[in-house]
UniProtKB/Swiss-Prot annotation:
Keyword annotations: Cytoplasm, Methyltransferase, RNA-binding, rRNA processing, S-adenosyl-L-methionine, Transferase
Organism: Clostridium botulinum (strain 657 / Type Ba4)
Chemical reaction(s) catalysed: adenosine(1518)/adenosine(1519) in 16S rRNA + 4 S-adenosyl-L-methionine = N(6)-dimethyladenosine(1518)/N(6)-dimethyladenosine(1519) in 16S rRNA + 4 S-adenosyl-L-homocysteine + 4 H(+)
Name recorded for this polypeptide: Ribosomal RNA small subunit methyltransferase A
Gene3D superfamilies in alphabetical order: Ribosomal RNA adenine dimethylase-like, domain 2, Vaccinia Virus protein VP39
Nucleotidyltransferase found in the keyword field: no
EC class: transferase
PROSITE patterns: RRNA_A_DIMETH, SAM_RNA_A_N6_MT
Length: 275
């Protein structure tokens, strides 16, 4: 059965508070599966399985699938619809409260697939990356504007701290755009399926990741300010900061949105050296 048929079969009522929008376009499901490149060696962690339409396809292709679902009304539906699969584990929990490192212990070739309410997208991505979770890739449906921020380049308005965070840890690839007409109920925004492939090493080597991300966040907190003014929040004396900019070869009058990840790395290392 397709998504609409399962929803009607169980007379499922959508929970607006959970931001539920279920994918009904089968071509999008196929593109997610193809883009995620799932095979029989993979353990898949699915966040937000809905009524299990995509989950079935994952179960057919993967070694095992762990699906995380918050809505208690969906649990019996998923249990019934997927009862024939012995490689399926259903976790009834808020994904924001999951210990992903524990869940991933002793598992090889972990790939994540997610179709999340958009309000939790950035927190989930940030946690998976900053907590050093051991996964190969994350294929996720997200709001178009967030995908554009993740996939942005310097010198554009979408480029910001989220861009740097994701691209520090991952290669990014947009798989396809998704119209609101592909969902029930119909959301008010366009969506994009994007894949994040985890790098074996961060894109740049830095002396302190904590300082690196502090510099990045400070540089974007007030986008129209120069780096010199933005980085005053680090509370470093004027002479030391002048020295750091000079050693990094970066003009302090530039704005954060003009710096590449490599330049952020160079600047943070030079600041680290003078602390």
């Amino acid at each position: 059965m397709n998504t609409k048929e399962i929803v009607n079969k169980y007379e499922f009522k959508f929970n607006k508070n959970l931001g539920q929008n279920f994918l009904i376009d089968e071509s999008v499901l196929e593109d997610i599966i193809e883009g995620a490149e799932i095979n029989k060696e993979d353990t898949v962690i699915e966040i937000g399985p809905g009524v299990g339409t995509l989950t079935k396809e994952l179960l057919e292709r993967a070694k095992e699938v762990y699906s995380i679902e918050l809505d208690g009304d969906l649990i019996p539906i998923l249990q019934e619809e997927l009862k024939e699969y012995n490689n399926f584990t259903l976790i009834h929990k808020d994904a924001l409260k999951i210990d992903f490192n524990r869940l991933m212990e002793n598992k090889d070739s972990i790939k994540l697939v997610a179709n999340l309410p958009y309000y939790v997208t950035t927190p989930i991505i940030s946690r998976l990356l900053t907590e050093k979770c051991d996964f190969k890739s994350l294929t996720i449906m997200i709001q178009k504007e967030v995908a554009e921020r993740i996939n942005a380049e310097p010198n554009c308005k979408e480029y910001g701290s989220l861009t740097v965070l994701v691209q520090y840890y991952c290669d990014t690839k947009i798989i396809r755009k998704v119209s609101p007409n592909c969902f029930i109920p119909r959301p008010k925004v366009d969506s994009i399926v994007i894949k994040l492939d985890r790098l074996s090493e961060p894109r740049v080597r830095v002396k302190s990741e904590k300082l690196f991300f502090n510099v990045v966040r400070s540089s974007f907190n007030m986008r129209r300010k120069t780096l010199w003014n933005s980085l005053k929040s680090l509370n470093i004396n004027k002479e030391s900061m002048e020295n750091a900019f000079e050693r990094a070869g970066i003009d302090s009058k530039r704005r954060g949105e003009t710096l590449s990840i490599e330049e952020f790395g160079k600047l943070s290392d030079c600041i680290y050296d003078i602390l």
